Amino acid sequence: MKSVRYLIGLFAFIACYYLLPISTRLLWQPDETRYAEISREMLASGDWIVPHLLGLRYFEKPIAGYWINSIGQWLFGANNFGVRAGVIFATLLTAALVTWFTLRLWRDKRLALLAAVIYLSLFIVYAIGTYAVLDPFIAFWLVAGMCSFWLAMQAQTWKGKSAGFLLLGITCGMGVMTKGFLALAVPVLSVLPWVATQKRWKDLFIYGWLAVISCILTVLPWGLAIAQREPDFWHYFFWVEHIQRFAMDDAQHRAPFWYYLPVIIAGSLPWLGLLPGALYAGWQNRKHSATVYLLSWTIMPLLFFSVAKGKLPTYILSCFAPLAMLMAHYALLAAKNNPLALRINGWINIAFGVTGIIATFVVSPWGPMNTPVWQTFESYKVFCAWSIFSLWAFFGWYTLTNVEKTWPFAALCPLGLALLVGFSIPDRVMEGKHPQFFVEMTQESLQPSRYILTDSVGVAAGLAWSLQRDDIIMYRQTGELKYGLNYPDAKGRFVSGDEFANWLNQHRQEGIITLVLSVDRDEDINSLAIPSADVIDRQERLVLIQYRPK
């Protein structure tokens, strides 16, 4: 009966965090709108080989992540949940692997379940795992690779070892098809310390080639197909998206070496109090083969991405699966022997919740700020934000009431965040970051437009997805579409600021022309260097400018 209660509680937890509230959150630009539109175009065109964005070739990532996203929209429709269904599915599958692997290592069902709950409730896992980007997919393939390699090395027969290494190659191949060659570097770096300490080089050299073969065979069909259709894909993807993005001096998203330290700290909430102890206990217990393995998969990718010049918080998502397992193991030991870390964790959550309540008041209409985040008419959003932090503090307090038994309830600290964050986003943020909000406000003007131009790729993708059309024209800025716009068949998909007046004169009689511009909050739109318009509709950071036939 206790196992049944645990399972019911787990399903209720998943429903409240990962299913019920997802549709209440509008898509964020540029990431979610971009991936939503790429998958919509894939479904509309039936082209499952070459990724396109706004009808243009888009070579920033391989194809597998788009396949999964497309299946999500195919199953659930072109809506917020459909767009995020793929990443949610991948996150839940990763949690299932965490459960299975923990059970295999320690033969403890309660520990395995707690590891999954800790993983799913980690702030960084929840934030990225319900956000339509490709990182939850690559995290799943990396964690699957972690499990496969362990299976291979623990197998006692040549058949078992062969199967494990073949499975490892498939996971690496799917990782390559999701986000590129990092899916090869991370597993190699992660297993080497364990192989060295356990002196298992022989098995690696004898069976490792099976992983190489299965990886190549996994990638080969699509790799050849894309090379035949678009011969320059692999050159662009390897040199620009890998070498330049991560290693060159002009790498994208440059950040210092210590960049991931605050990410680890914030991402470990509401289990931050367990982080130092879990890592320290893992190091103390490094003679235990499984502990060394989990530590290696936690630390080595973190060091690798810290050394790389280009950094984003999403890159280290896979580190949190083995970390959650170490945290769960340490928490059960602490509950039995010395619950100090569990008490500290409770106080950290209380402090975080109280700090959030105070910060919400400071930036509210009733606080001391001259320009509050929320306006007076958004008071219900302020109360939603207060509720988020109040629930966080409450469950932090509850874990202290009988800490040896109640510490797992820290998993409910983000419950308010999961249920209410979609209702607490300020209008000033929505107007700039949620193109759906803009489309809802200007639907009647946008729908009949013959041409729509915009100066933001994220906004363009949001307009295209909401309006179900891929012919949005880039105005003045090319952004990440620069490479796709260089193709001869992309002529006419970009209009510079200097050319706009002439372009307008040539196309005005064909129908309504709509220009959607991103502007600063205090920018005077009357000073924009554009021809006089028939309609100007400003929605804070986005402006709709319309020209009708004359």
Curated annotation (Swiss-Prot):
Pfam families from the UniProt entry: PMT (PF02366)
A GO term from the CC aspect: plasma membrane
Coiled coil residues, start to end: none
EC number assigned by the record: 2.4.2.43
Record's catalysed reaction(s): 4-amino-4-deoxy-alpha-L-arabinopyranosyl di-trans,octa-cis-undecaprenyl phosphate + lipid IVA = lipid IIA + di-trans,octa-cis-undecaprenyl phosphate
Transmembrane segments: 7-27, 81-101, 113-133, 134-154, 165-185, 204-224, 263-283, 288-308, 315-335, 346-366, 382-402, 406-426
Localisation: Cell inner membrane
Pathway(s) of this molecule: Lipopolysaccharide metabolism; 4-amino-4-deoxy-beta-L-arabinose-lipid A biosynthesis
Topology within the bilayer: Multi-pass membrane protein
Record's keyword annotation contains Calcium: no
Gene Ontology biological-process entries: lipid A biosynthetic process; lipopolysaccharide biosynthetic process; protein O-linked glycosylation; response to iron(III) ion
InterPro entries: ArnT_tfrase (IPR022839), Glyco_trans_39/83 (IPR003342), LipidA_mod_glycosyltrf_83 (IPR050297)
Alphabetized GO MF terms: 4-amino-4-deoxy-L-arabinose transferase activity; mannosyltransferase activity
Function: Catalyzes the transfer of the L-Ara4N moiety of the glycolipid undecaprenyl phosphate-alpha-L-Ara4N to lipid A. The modified arabinose is attached to lipid A and is required for resistance to polymyxin and cationic antimicrobial peptides.
HAMAP family registered for this protein in UniProt: ArnT_transfer (MF_01165)
Family: Belongs to the glycosyltransferase 83 family.
PANTHER family per the UniProt record, alphabetical: MANNOSYLTRANSFERASE YKCB-RELATED, UNDECAPRENYL PHOSPHATE-ALPHA-4-AMINO-4-DEOXY-L-ARABINOSE ARABINOSYL TRANSFERASE
Protein name: Undecaprenyl phosphate-alpha-4-amino-4-deoxy-L-arabinose arabinosyl transferase
Species of provenance: Escherichia coli O127:H6 (strain E2348/69 / EPEC)
Taxonomic classification: Bacteria, Pseudomonadati, Pseudomonadota, Gammaproteobacteria, Enterobacterales
Name of the gene encoding the protein in the UniProt record: arnT
